[in-house]
Amino acid sequence: MSEPRRIYSIDIFRGMTIALMILVNNPGSWGHVYAPLLHAKWHGCTLTDLVFPFFLFLVGASMRFAFVKWHYYPSPKFYKHIFWRTVSIFMAGWFIHAYPFIVQDWDWSSFRYFGVLQRIAIAYGISALLIIRYDFKQLLPIISGILIFYWGLLWLGGTGDPYGLEENLVRKVDIFLFGEKHLYGGFGIPFDPEGLLSAIPS
C-alpha cells in the first residue's frame, strides 16, 4: 500500500476551521457577541453556521487522498477499516455526551443519541462506501438524487410549514424514534440539528 502524502491546503483549512470553532464556542462574553459569531435562529446563514459543513468538507476531501493507499479497491480489509473508523467516531460522540460518567444521579433518560461526531461518522461511513463503489460521473446523479429526495421528503412529510422549526419531518421522526428528552433543546423546543433524518443530505 502506498502512503498518502500531506496536502498542506487541507491542513491549513482544517486549522482555520478549528480556530473559527474555538472563537465561536468561546467568544469571550456571551452578552456581547458579534452577529457573525452566532448561529442563524432558523432561516439564513452566518459564518458560524459554516463551521460544521467545513468539517464535513474536510472529511470528504481527506478521504480522496487517504484512500490512495487502498487503491480504491473494495477489499474486505478496506471495508473493515471503514467500519471501525465509522464506529470509533460515532462512539467518541457518545463518550463526550456521557462524560462525566460517575456523576451521582446521572440521568440517562435524557442522553442525547446524536451530535456532531455522530453525524460525521454517518457521513464518513456512507460516503466512503459510495466513493469506493462509484466513479465521479456516477456519483453526480447519486448526490443530486439524494438532495432532491430529501427536499421532497421534507415537503411531503411536513405539515403547515414543512421547512419551519416546529412542523418539519426531521423533528417528527426524531421525536417518534427517540423521544423529546433525547433531543437537543437549544431551540426552545426539542429539535436535534444532527438528528437521524437530517443526516441524509450530509
What is each stretch, according to the model?
Residues P27-T46, P100-Y113, P162-F176, K181-F191:
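Membrane-interface interhelical loops and short amphipathic "cap" helices
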Residues M16, A40, F114, I120-A123, ...:
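Surface-exposed loop/turn and secondary-structure junction residues enriched for glycine/proline
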Residues R14-M16, V59, A92, F114, ...:
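Short glycine-rich loop/turn motifs that provide flexible caps or phosphate-binding loops at active sites
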Residues D49-F54, K69-H97, F101-Q104, S109-S127, ...:
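Transmembrane alpha-helical segments and their boundary/interface "anchor" motifs
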Residues M1-F78:
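N-terminal signal-anchor module of multipass membrane proteins
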Residues L20-P27, R85-I89, L169-V173:
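An acidic intrinsically disordered interaction segment
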Residues F136-S202:
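Long hydrophobic alpha-helical segments that form multi-pass transmembrane helix bundles
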